[in-house]
Structures are given as C-alpha cells and as structure tokens.
Regions:
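Solvent-exposed loop/turn segments at secondary-structure junctions
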Residues: 96, 113-114, 139-140, 153-154, ...
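Low-complexity, intrinsically disordered terminal/linker segments enriched in charged
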Residues: 177-223
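Bacterial N-terminal signal peptides that target proteins for export
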Residues: 2-16, 24
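Compositionally biased, proline/threonine/alanine/serine-rich low-complexity intrinsically disordered stretches
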Residues: 28-50, 54, 207, 211-223
Length: 223
C-alpha cells in the first residue's frame, strides 16, 4: 500500500475509533442477544468502526456538498473516545519531558485539527463496504492498556490489519494509538516532528500547525 493510501486509511481508522456515540450502544445490545458480548475494549473498536462506515454511507451526499458538516461531525466526537493529550505526549516523546501541561494540550489540539483538516476529505472516498473483524485482545506491558487487533475486510482485496491501543481513563476506554499494517500513528508523527521540535518550542510548532505553515504528513515545514 502506498504511503499516501496509508495516511488516508490512518485517518479513517482514527475517525472510526473516535466517532462512537449513543447509537454505538445499539450495536452492542444487538450483539449481546446473539452471542457473548465482547470485552469493553473490543466493543469500542467494533461499534465505533461500524458506526463511522454506516454514517459515511448514509450521509455521503450531504458531506460532499457541505464539507463544514463533515468537519463538524468529526470534531464533535473527536474528544469523546480519543485520548488526544496522552497521544500528543507520546508523539512529542523526549520533547514532552518537563513540558507544561498547557503546552502539551496546545500541541494536541493543533495536531488533531491539522490531521482532520488535511485528511478528513479522504473519508468521503473510502469504501464503506468494508467489514470490521476483531481478532484478539492483548494486555500491553506495564499495565499500559490493551491492544485490540482487528482487520478491515475488503470485498476486492486482502484484509487490512488495524491495531488499536486503548487505555482506561476515568473508567472509560480511550484510544491513544492506531497502527495500520504496522504503521503507528504515534511513531509516524513522532518521526515527523522530532526535527522541528529540536529547533523550536512546542508552542511554536503548534502555532505553525494552526496556520498551515507546517502540516501533518508533510516534510516538517509544510512545504
């Protein structure tokens, strides 16, 4: 799979992890009547993935005609299930050591907004005939959370492996990393932002993300 395709798919699986809301509980209840309910972490992945694909199919025409509606839809759920501050801390890596919480949040917000702004439109071109299958669930070392291994089943191609790393935050499972065919969201952007962060402060990098001077998935300069 080409890098650009991986980035587009990364956006989709990130969104599918983020966009579970009240209707997702319907999927959970329906599943419980036919087979033993999966764990809460696995159900998070299954229900949210199903939700995003279903919603894309139902509202595709609306979103194509009104990009602002797509952005609002994504942003309205972004904070619900994605632990963006923790993920941002992991992306910052060594640069997060000793950093103020406010600076990390500033970077987290700028990173999330830039990601969805650049790749959000890719959602409209994605194949909604995909099915999601949860394969396994494994505890992460050190009690850091759980890895939920899943596959996106395509009618015209090999399954796409997608792993979600989730952890408990205030009694709720939240996603902090997604790996598509072994490509990690956290590691991808840690590699991109390492060089800029060696030259500039976290607020400066966040500001450049906000203005578009620097873009996620770019070369670090937005050029």
């Amino acid at each position: 799979m080409k890098i650009s395709m991986k980035r587009s798919l990364l956006t989709v699986v990130l969104s599918s992890a983020l966009l579970a809301a009240a209707p997702a509980t319907v999927f959970a209840q329906a599943a419980a009547t036919t087979k033993p309910a999966p764990s809460a972490a696995s159900q998070l992945v299954l229900s949210s993935s199903t939700r995003i694909l279903t919603t894309l199919e139902k509202r595709r025409a609306e979103f194509k005609g009104n990009p602002a509606a797509l952005k609002q839809y994504v942003n309205s759920e972004f904070n619900t299930l994605f632990d963006r501050d923790y993920a941002a801390r992991l992306v910052l890596g060594v640069h997060a050591r000793g950093a103020a919480e406010g600076d990390i949040k500033l970077f987290a917000d700028a990173l999330g907004d830039s990601l969805m702004s650049r790749y959000g439109s890719a959602l409209l071109d994605f194949n909604t005939k995909l099915r999601v299958r949860v394969k396994s669930e494994t505890a992460l070392p050190g009690g850091r959370g759980v890895k939920v291994a899943s596959e996106m089943l395509r009618p015209d191609g090999d399954p796409i492996p997608v792993d979600y790393l989730v952890r408990q935050v205030g009694g709720q499972w939240k996603v902090f990393d997604v790996m598509v065919e072994g490509v990690s969201f956290v590691q991808t952007f840690r590699n991109q932002f390492d060089a800029p962060l060696r030259q500039k402060s976290i607020p400066q990098v966040a500001a450049e993300l906000r203005t578009g001077k620097m873009q996620v998935g770019g070369n670090g300069s937005g050029k």
